[in-house]
Design a protein with these regions (language model features):
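The feature marks the mature, well-folded catalytic cores of soluble enzymes
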Residues: 1-171
């Protein structure tokens, strides 16, 4: 796992994104100092952002630390919303994007994976965003039905991208 994390710190990756991907990097927020204390916030799935409401949702796990989330949110001007979640075996869900995705008009969430005491506040916050809440169960979560991404084309149309396995688990 250390080798994986080291690979993610290479500045060449940012240069490649700029040169080959056409992305501009205007700011780099380096939270890697937390790794020395064993605290992580893996960038690709630990946090699901609601850009419209400026809320950063994070399912706490060994890969997602609440203190690092708080620092990220303070730097970005987002409200942190941390919660716990487990799979069907009681194991902590490792990344938030396994159970939650947020699009313009809808949200996909596996609320049954969240402890009862945290479920109502989470659902209330998601509903307050004005989006339709689409509930999935733990079996659908295990098939990555919560791991979806809304993409926008140049003409403004949107599509919801997900794996064939995820799509096959919707009714």
């Amino acid at each position: 796992e250390r080798r994986y994390r080291d690979a993610n710190h290479k500045p060449e990756m940012l240069v490649a994104l700029e040169q080959r991907g056409g992305f501009g990097v205007s700011r780099l927020l380096d939270l890697s100092h937390h790794e020395l204390s064993g605290r992580f916030l893996e960038g690709t799935g630990s946090v699901v952002f609601d850009h419209r409401s400026r809320v950063a949702y994070a399912c706490l796990s060994p890969r997602t630390n609440g203190d690092v989330l708080a620092e990220l949110c303070e730097e970005l001007g987002y409200e942190p919303f941390a919660f716990d979640a487990t799979d069907g075996e009681g194991v902590a869900v490792y990344h938030t994007n396994v159970l939650l995705s947020i699009g313009r008009r809808s949200v996909i969430v596996c609320a049954e994976a969240v402890p009862q005491a945290q479920r109502a506040p989470l659902l209330g916050r998601l509903q307050a965003s004005g989006r339709e809440v689409v509930a999935i169960d733990r079996a659908q979560m295990a098939a990555f039905a919560g791991n979806a991404l809304e993409l926008e084309a140049a003409d403004g149309t949107t599509v919801l991208a997900m794996s064939d396995r995820a799509l096959g688990n919707f009714d």
